């Protein structure tokens, strides 16, 4: 996936060619510090979109039809049905996708390695990329500290998200 996005976002890639075809000016998506992280994020979101779609589809199919029928009998319109029936039933799936997404976002490595190698000017450097680079350079102290902090941060973020979910339900 990352190789495909690297080719699409290259200076002479398809996206710049389409922009130039319509009279615009191509961007240096992967070599400009202002746009490199955005390009990596777009590739990561696109890569995870199918997984999240399947989770939401399964959650939607798990909502009993009787709830929608009861809402219709009570005179609820589409917006009210969504807020009162669909959204509460999707809450566990939303939490799951959110937690997995946050954890995945902090563990992005392959997209950055393939697309930018942490550059330009370290603009796409993430904790995991930093950790792996330090490990490869045998700077094990910094690598271990980064790994420990990553685990602690992800545990705290997950605990906060779970607590928010418990309060909401």
Question: What is each stretch, according to the model?
Answer:
Residues 1-169:
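A structural signal for multi-pass alpha-helical bundles of membrane permease subunits
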């Amino acid at each position: 996936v990352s190789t495909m996005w690297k080719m699409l976002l290259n200076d002479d890639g398809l996206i710049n060619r389409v922009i130039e075809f319509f009279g615009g000016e191509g961007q240096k998506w992967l070599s400009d510090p202002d746009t490199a992280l955005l390009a990596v994020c777009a590739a990561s979101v696109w890569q995870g979109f199918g997984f999240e779609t399947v989770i939401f589809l399964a959650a939607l199919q798990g909502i009993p039809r009787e709830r929608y029928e009861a809402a219709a009998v009570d005179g609820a319109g589409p917006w009210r049905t969504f807020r009162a029936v669909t959204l509460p039933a999707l809450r566990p799936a939303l939490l799951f996708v959110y937690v997995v997404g946050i954890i995945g976002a902090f563990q992005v490595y392959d997209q950055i390695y393939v697309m930018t190698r942490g550059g330009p000017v370290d603009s796409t450097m993430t904790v995991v990329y930093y950790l792996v680079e330090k490990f490869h350079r045998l700077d094990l102290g910094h690598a271990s500290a980064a790994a420990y902090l990553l685990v602690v941060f992800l545990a705290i973020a997950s605990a906060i998200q779970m607590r928010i979910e418990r309060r909401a339900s």
